[in-house]
Regions:
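Aromatic-rich, lipid-facing transmembrane alpha helices and their immediate juxtamembrane interface loops
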Residues: 1-174
Length: 174
């Protein structure tokens, strides 16, 4: 099962943004109990997952995941079991993951970090933009709309249906 949400690399916008937001929101919680961090993660993770699902459907007309078959789900967008996973992830990230990443970043020379950050940000911005365009074109193509310009021809050649179905195997048009 693919958890990737971008056409280049095994990157997940949902998980990547969740880690970034968790880092910002939890950085002042180091002295809190694990149960408090867990509860925060359950609530915030569930809210975040619900919003991501709704935004994905609004922007792309696609449902990327559907939890309707789970007990205690809300509109199939989120369910209680996965909210618990978000809580566990919050504790693991704050206590183990982030400290390891911070130590690893300390090994990178100070003058290299800004350039690494800029290059990674540019790559991810291009990757997200291209992924959005490819997904929009895929939706048009499956509706029988032929390419209208060179960009759409490029997208059809490089991001054909088979590739898009590998990247987004669970996506369902609404």
């Amino acid at each position: 099962m693919s958890r990737s949400s971008l056409v280049w690399g095994p990157f997940s916008v949902v998980w990547g943004l969740a880690l970034a937001l968790s880092t910002v929101l939890l950085r002042n919680c180091e002295n809190k109990s694990d149960s408090a961090i867990f509860a925060f993660g359950v609530f915030m993770g569930g809210a975040y997952e619900y919003v991501c699902s709704a935004v994905g459907e609004l922007l792309f007309g696609v449902i990327f995941w559907d939890y309707s078959g789970f007990k205690f789900n809300i509109a199939g967008r989120v369910n209680l079991l996965y909210c618990f996973f978000w809580g566990i992830a919050a504790v693991v990230w704050l206590r183990l993951g982030y400290p390891l990443v911070a130590k690893g970043m300390d090994l990178v020379r100070r003058h290299v970090k800004p350039w690494m950050t800029i290059l990674l940000a540019i790559f991810m911005a291009v990757n997200m933009s291209l992924s959005g365009l490819a997904l929009a074109r895929y939706n048009s193509r499956t509706d029988g709309i032929t390419p209208q310009n060179q960009l759409e021809v490029f997208l059809d050649e490089h991001f054909d249906n088979a590739r898009m179905e590998r990247v987004y195997p669970n996506a369902k048009k609404t």
